[in-house]
Amino acid sequence: MYDKFKPEQAVGLMDFVRAAKSCIKEISPDELKAKLNAKEDFLLVDVRESSEFEHGRISGAHLVPRGIIEAAADTSYPKHYPPLSGARNQQIVVYCATSGRSAMAAAVLQMMGYKNVLNLAGGYTRWEIEGNPVVREAEY
């Protein structure tokens, strides 16, 4: 993804999001809901910040903020996150608030060798607006 930009070019956030979206696959809220209802085996990763996660999330999601995704996914890093770092060959669905951060996270995971990463189109915002179930309290 980064090879599309030359050092002399000034780039902004949306340039990175567009570049990421050009090389990843997305899943619609309806498709994700069907996967959840069918109890398919995949890892659901919320890349928002913890304060966003605490206000509401999709049931079963693992919180791995975008700012630490590379460290969490790298088994050679001492503080990696085993559910993510061990899912290299498993399907992973990532989401954020509107799908920008998660698009970049999906692209990075692919660059790190993850084989089957999907980004939730429209993110948590679209998921919630479309009336899909959310969790607003702790899950144990």
Indicate residue ranges for each PLM-predicted region:
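Short, surface-exposed ligand- or partner-binding patches at beta-edge/loop junctions that are enriched
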Residues: 95
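Rhodanese-like catalytic fold shared by cysteine-dependent sulfurtransferases
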Residues: 1-42, 50-91, 100-140
